[in-house]
């Protein structure tokens, strides 16, 4: 799934998220894709949250990933509500598809 990301843009953020998760016994993540009804824009999103304190550790979506211009960004750049981009007014009418919520217990 992550092979489609630009290498070096998000890799350090993903490593940071992994280290955040190493101390948690449970965490959840969700994935989703959406497209505008008129077919002019498509996108995806991924987020992971610590179940214990309900905080979102990392949120990645196609808009923020593409706007980096191949520059590495701090983890805080990606910490956002997962649907901020997919549901933004800029998208207009949209169709959501393939939204999944997952939970992992160690």
UniProtKB/Swiss-Prot annotation:
TM regions (residue ranges): none
Subcellular location(s) per record: Mitochondrion
Superkingdom, natural source: Eukaryota
One biological process term in Gene Ontology: cellular response to oxidative stress
Alphabetical UniProt keywords: Mitochondrion, Stress response
Entry keyword annotation includes Glycoprotein: no
Inducing stimuli: Expression is up-regulated by heat and in response to hydroxyurea. This regulation is under the control of the protein kinases sty1 and rad3.
GO cellular component: mitochondrion
Disruption phenotype: Leads to reduced growth rate and altered ROS generation during stress conditions like heat or treatment by hydroxyurea.
Function: Stress-responsive protein that may play a role in regulation of cell cycle.
Name of the protein: Stress-responsive protein 1
Species, as recorded: Schizosaccharomyces pombe (strain 972 / ATCC 24843)
Taxonomic placement: Eukaryota, Fungi, Dikarya, Ascomycota, Taphrinomycotina
């Amino acid at each position: 799934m992550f092979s489609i990301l630009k290498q070096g843009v998000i890799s350090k953020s993903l490593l940071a998220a992994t280290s955040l998760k190493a101390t948690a016994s449970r965490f959840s993540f969700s994935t989703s894709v959406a497209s505008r009804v008129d077919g002019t824009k498509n996108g995806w999103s991924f987020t992971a949250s610590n179940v214990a304190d309900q905080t979102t550790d990392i949120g990645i979506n196609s808009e923020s990933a593409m706007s980096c211009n191949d520059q590495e960004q701090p983890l805080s750049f990606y910490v956002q509500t997962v649907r901020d981009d997919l549901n933004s007014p800029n998208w207009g009418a949209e169709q959501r598809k393939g939204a999944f919520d997952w939970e992992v217990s160690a």
